[in-house]
Amino acid sequence: LDTLIDDDVNNWETMIDTNIKGFLAVLRIVSKQMVKQGSGHIINIGSVAGVESYAKGGVYCATKHAVHAISQSLREEMVEHGIKVSEILPGAVNTEFSKVRFHGDDQRAQSVYQGFEPLAAEDVAELIVYNANLPYHVNLAECLILAGAQSRATKIHRKI
């Protein structure tokens, strides 16, 4: 993550290709199949960055805002086909994401999680399973899930 003027354009292209174009390509295939079968439940994984922007995250936040907007739009389009669309918006989750964004720098990646207990991938997975198992008449349309020490995208209470 870097400022807009200092970031590498190749990073932008990778984020846009992955977080928007890749997301749309998969979503289109899945949506078409669900419309054919007349039912389904699409659960998209967005990010707190899709509803809150922050410094040095402009392009990443923009791609996650796109996921959020597409999820909302698709929910409107799919409801008449009997298809639910939900979005899970995780905050700080201890995954390989930090290692990727810091280009393999393990020390820098682990520093992101110092002084607090982040969410684990299993925490997010449990929410997805819960959402998927709700009765058809219930749609948990959007769910922001944060670590207990996190109140906003970049506001984390650290005990160091």
Which stretches of residues belong to each language-model region?
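Residue(s) in the substrate-gating loop at a strand-loop-helix junction
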Residues: S47
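C-terminal helical subdomain
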Residues: E87-I88, T95, Q107-T154
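Alpha-helical segment proximal to the catalytic Tyr-Lys
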Residues: K32, E76-V79
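Active-site helix of classical SDR
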Residues: L27, T63
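Active-site loop immediately N-terminal to the catalytic Tyr-X3-Lys motif
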Residues: I5, Y54-G58
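A short helix-coil junction within the Rossmann-fold of NAD(P)-dependent oxidoreductases
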Residues: D2, I29-G38
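Substrate-binding pocket helix/loop in short-chain dehydrogenase/reductase
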Residues: D2-L4, D8-E13
